[in-house]
Amino acid sequence: MTQPLIIANTPFSSRLFTGTGKFPNSLIMQQALIESGSELATMALKRVDVSNPEDDILKPIMTAGINLLPNTSGAKNAREAIFAAQLAREALQTNWLKLEIHPDPKYLMPDPIETLKAAEELVRQGFIVLPYCHADPVLCKRLEEVGCAAVMPLGAPIGSNKGIVSRDFLEIIIDQAKVPVVVDAGIGAPSHAAFAMELGADAVLVNTAIAAARNPVAMATAFKLAVQSGRLAYENGLVSVSSQAVASSPLTAFLD
């Protein structure tokens, strides 16, 4: 049994957060989210009609009892992100926000300057801000200092499925963070998610690897188990890596 995750005084028993894009249909999306055990699902504000409770994305999440994490994907600067956040809060009655600002549509790299600027203002306005950002230890510390409830550094570019290519920087971020660290983007296999948890990440967010799988519902189960396994291993002390062989049995001669 692992310890619960706390973000902004809200407890989560699952450390797997999920996205809602790229699923074949809304029913499969709902089934996968439920099977994943996730308690927090993010959705792009540009893809939903927040004023319509029957929306194909919004309704399945809400009827499944999963908490909403609106995101500002598509915003190109702080001004656009703040405007989108204000609309979401009014329509959905939530202060929770995944802040995403990526002006380049080809690589979807988060803009660090605009993200920090928007985060500071949104925190001032009372939002619970979870910013998607580069795996930059200095930036993550600055985001923490302006009041973000967690930081969400990337493991690899969005949708790349490359896994944890930013390991060295993630380890620094995790080591110095005083808020939860949620590894977001690039996680393409359950083993990637388990590895992120073994490094000490507090949670992971997975979308493409579940939604685009041949069987998204079964893949959601695989990720649920991987996250649980990785966190359990981290909490109970992984053995250190050695460049030499270390015997597990006595080294005395066989006939002694």
Curated annotation (Swiss-Prot):
**Mainly localized where?**
cytoplasm
Q: Which reaction does it catalyse?
A: [ThiS sulfur-carrier protein]-C-terminal-Gly-aminoethanethioate + 2-iminoacetate + 1-deoxy-D-xylulose 5-phosphate = [ThiS sulfur-carrier protein]-C-terminal Gly-Gly + 2-[(2R,5Z)-2-carboxy-4-methylthiazol-5(2H)-ylidene]ethyl phosphate + 2 H2O + H(+)
Q: In which pathway does it act?
A: Cofactor biosynthesis; thiamine diphosphate biosynthesis
Single GO BP term: thiamine diphosphate biosynthetic process
Protein EC: 2.8.1.10
Which GO cellular component terms are attached? cytoplasm
Q: What is the active site of this protein?
A: K98
Q: Name one GO molecular function term.
A: thiazole synthase activity
Q: Which Gene3D superfamilies does this entry report, sorted A to Z? A: Aldolase class I
Q: Tell me where it resides.
A: Cytoplasm
Print the keywords alphabetically: Cytoplasm, Schiff base, Thiamine biosynthesis, Transferase
Mention any Pfam family matching this sequence.
ThiG
Q: State where 1-deoxy-D-xylulose 5-phosphate binds.
A: G159, A185, G186, N207, T208
Task: List all disulphide bridges recorded for this chain.
Answer: none
The record's note on quaternary structure and interaction partners says: Homotetramer. Forms heterodimers with either ThiH or ThiS.
What HAMAP family does the database record attribute to this sequence?
A: ThiG
Q: Give the family from UniProt.
A: Belongs to the ThiG family.
Function text: Catalyzes the rearrangement of 1-deoxy-D-xylulose 5-phosphate (DXP) to produce the thiazole phosphate moiety of thiamine. Sulfur is provided by the thiocarboxylate moiety of the carrier protein ThiS. In vitro, sulfur can be provided by H(2)S.
What name has this protein been given in UniProt?
Thiazole synthase
What is the name of the gene encoding this protein?
thiG
